[in-house]
């Protein structure tokens, strides 16, 4: 590797072993669920970790990472470009950037310039703002494809943690339909996080049922973003196609977000 990354041999060794362990864990979860591990994406959550970690993960074969703050993600992309170019590994355009945090409508324009996928879309007004921003970015050649969208579902109706209230009849369907009918967005599927006081098995079972119901209306919405470091096995059992892993892969957070 070029000088910038060769200065981090210990970190590369750490991530190499952690990634291998996480891939083995995911494979075991898929086998236990009778599923093909190839249909489940392992998404490293790199918020509060430096661009050097993203570059090392890229070198190890990871092509997608998750961020939760627009300012941090934008700065990291610029630094990653420099690191990958120096290491002759390409550029950050080879990385698929996922927005996994809550999205403010006034950040839609910025998000449209860097994110490939958004996991936390949960309101009609946000869909409208993102659609408008992505269409503009496409027209200005700032991006080359639609924004992939997971509609976030709230299983208990508590809006403080984000998500469309799945206990309100028709609420999830309306947001999914709005995304499906938009010009700049592509409906990937649903995302959900178990409520704090719920058993994960019960939560993911309910999320899977909601996803199955949505897929009956929107057959292309095959994605289910569910499961993190402490519950990915349960999520995989209930159909997750994308597990979001942070500290179990990367260790303690190393940066403060800008």
From Swiss-Prot:
MF GO annotations: pyridoxal phosphate binding
Pfam families: Ala_racemase_N (PF01168)
Residues with N6-(pyridoxal phosphate)lysine modification: 47
Keywords associated with the record: Pyridoxal phosphate
Tagged with keyword NAD: no
Any one of the GO CC terms: cytoplasm
SUPFAM superfamilies in UniProt: PLP-binding barrel (SSF51419)
Record InterPro entries: Ala_racemase_N (IPR001608), PLP-binding_barrel (IPR029066), PyrdxlP_homeostasis (IPR011078)
Protein's UniProt keywords contain Transmembrane helix: no
Function per UniProt: Pyridoxal 5'-phosphate (PLP)-binding protein, which is involved in PLP homeostasis.
Family label: Belongs to the pyridoxal phosphate-binding protein YggS/PROSC family.
PANTHER family named among the record's database cross-references: PROLINE SYNTHETASE CO-TRANSCRIBED BACTERIAL HOMOLOG PROTEIN, PYRIDOXAL PHOSPHATE HOMEOSTASIS PROTEIN
NCBIfam families: YggS family pyridoxal phosphate-dependent enzyme (TIGR00044)
Protein name: Pyridoxal phosphate homeostasis protein
Organism: Mycobacterium tuberculosis (strain ATCC 25618 / H37Rv)
Lineage, uppermost ranks: Bacteria, Bacillati, Actinomycetota, Actinomycetes, Mycobacteriales
């Amino acid at each position: 590797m070029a000088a910038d990354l060769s200065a981090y041999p210990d970190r590369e060794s750490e991530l190499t072993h952690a990634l291998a362990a996480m891939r083995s864990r995911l494979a075991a979860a898929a086998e236990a669920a009778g599923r093909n591990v190839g249909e489940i994406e392992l998404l490293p959550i790199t918020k509060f970790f430096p661009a050097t970690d993203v570059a090392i993960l890229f070198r190890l074969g990871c092509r997608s990472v998750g961020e939760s703050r627009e300012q941090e993600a934008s700065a990291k992309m610029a630094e990653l470009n420099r690191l990958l170019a120096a290491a002759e590994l390409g550029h950050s355009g080879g990385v698929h950037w996922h927005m996994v945090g809550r999205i403010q409508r006034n950040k839609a324009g910025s998000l449209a310039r860097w994110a490939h996928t958004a996991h936390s879309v949960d309101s009609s007004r946000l869909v409208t703002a993102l659609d408008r921003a992505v269409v503009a970015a496409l027209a200005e050649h700032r991006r080359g494809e639609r924004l992939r969208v997971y509609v976030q579902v709230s299983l208990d109706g508590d809006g403080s943690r984000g998500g469309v209230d799945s206990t309100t009849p028709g609420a999830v369907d309306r947001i999914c339909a709005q995304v499906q009918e938009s010009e700049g967005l592509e409906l990937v599927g649903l995302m959900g996080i178990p409520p704090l006081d719920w058993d994960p098995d019960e939560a993911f079972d309910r999320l899977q049922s909601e996803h199955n119901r949505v897929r009956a209306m929107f057959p292309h919405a095959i994605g289910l973003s569910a499961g993190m470091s402490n519950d990915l096995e349960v999520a995989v059992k209930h159909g997750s196609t994308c597990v979001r892993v942070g500290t179990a892969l990367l260790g303690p957070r190393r940066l403060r977000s800008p």
